[in-house]
Structure formats: C-alpha cells, structure tokens
C-alpha cells in the first residue's frame, strides 16, 4: 500500500526510473535542470475505486479487503486504519496501478487487480484507457 491521492500521478510514478526523492529535492532547491529524470518505456494505468455516489453524496466507514497482489499495486486516497482494519473514508478510496510493456496490457492488469479489492458500495469505472486504446488502434 502506498499513500497518494492523485490518480494521474499514480499512473506515472511506476514508470519513473530516477530516484523520486532526488527529483523532489531538486525541484524544491531549484536545481531540477541538473538532474537526469528518466522514465522506462511501456505504459501504466491507474483505476480508481470510488465510493458509489462520489462526487456527490456517498457513505463511508466500510471495511476494505484486498488480495496481497492488489495491495502491492494500491495507492490509498480516501481510506483510514481502524486497528488492523482499513476503512473507506472518502469518495476516491483507492487507486490500483499496473505497469506493462503495452497500454492494453497495463489497462487489463489494472482492472484484473481491481477485482481483488472489495468494499461495500465499491464503484469502478469501466472506461479507463478506452479512448487512448481507440486512438492507438486508429494509428496502427
């Protein structure tokens, strides 16, 4: 489990080859031009698991369970610990991120991993990556 709250960043960080702390410190110090920021080839996809009703009215406080494999690819957003239990505590609950050699493989893997997460009122969009995959297909 990682802690982060921006799905767009969660979909890029797995591709970062450079040391994140070094990049952040250089950004803070105004020396980013002196740092080599490198990304691996391939693609990544982050599927956000939200509370049903988000962004309007939603309920929270539900126990979250997940497979070990899903937990290894999970960024926590709207969740909190209560003892040993992870509970929903917001609208955007978790981001499940997968990286793969191709966009199609990354999208499929992220959705497969998302199936390993359960909580009451879980909502998962089914269109993540669809437009990018369609555009990619048009270029082929």
Tell me what each language-model feature is.
Residues 2-71, 82:
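Active-site "cap" helix and flanking loop/linker of ATP-utilizing ligase/carboxylase catalytic domains
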Residues 48-50, 77, 99:
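Generic beta-strand/beta-sheet core signal
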